[in-house]
Structures are given as C-alpha cells and as structure tokens.
Amino acid sequence: MITIMAYIKFVERTLPYKYKDSSTYEDLLRYCGNPEKAVAAGVFRLESLTTAAAEMQCTAQQFHKDYGTRIQHIIITFTKRETPSLSMVQFIADACGRFFADRYQVAYYIHWEPNPHIHMIVNRVSFVDGKKYPDRFADRQAFWQHVRYVLSGYGIFLCK
C-alpha cells in the first residue's frame, strides 16, 4: 500500500510582514487564481471567485477592521510521488474550507505543480460579528486536527 503524505503551512506565521496592505485580498486571490496554475477552486460565504476580493474587503470595512493581518493563508501540500486524484483533493479542500465557513469567508484554489497543493485564503474578519480570527496556537492546532481527520478518511497521513 502506498502512503500519501501531506503537510500544512500557515504562511503568515513564517512571513509576519505579509498580508497587511490594502491590496492583500486582490493580490493573493489573483496569484492563487492564476489560470495557468489553478486547476480547481471554490468559495464559502462568498458570491463568486470573481468578486471574492471585493467581498472580503467590504466585510473588513463594514466592521472597521481593514488593518493589520487581513488574510489567513494556509497551504496544504501533498507529496508528488504518490499523487492523489484531483477529485480527492477537491473533496479535501471543500471539507477543510468548511472548518472556517461558519464565521469566515473562504476561497480555495488547487494547484498541481510542482506538487499538488491547496491554497486556502480565509478573511480574518468574521462576517458574523467582525471579530478577527485570533490565530492562537490552539486555533491552529484545532485546524490541524480537523485536516488530519479529513485526510485520514482518504488514507493520507498528515505530517507535523
């Protein structure tokens, strides 16, 4: 049996200066949605991928929270030697996006090169009450546990 392995990276944790300017939503969604790279995509609590950046910005402005780190950018990557199918990665992206969808707007894009990976872009301002995603260790750990649970259903091992 071949074991597929996956890793999670919380981008703004390794690059704390990222995602603080007013063009963050548009820039990151444009990069991740590049048609030369993205093979699939989806949204939660957004009308469409086309309007996602403006909708996220509007939510932040509505609650006067258009400052500081604006996006939670999470990458879930899979090892190339045992590549999962695109439909499997789409189901995984959808299940992982639902973790945030009760309070936050989410867009995800799936890229296939150099390794299959999911870019999950979460607006850090809640559309429910305007509170910012706290991004504490416990929050990241809860998401990691959720992803581990989702992946285990596909026989994929999540590395720490």
Name what the model sees in each region:
Residues 1-160:
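N-terminal nicking endonuclease/strand-transfer module with a His-rich metal-binding environment
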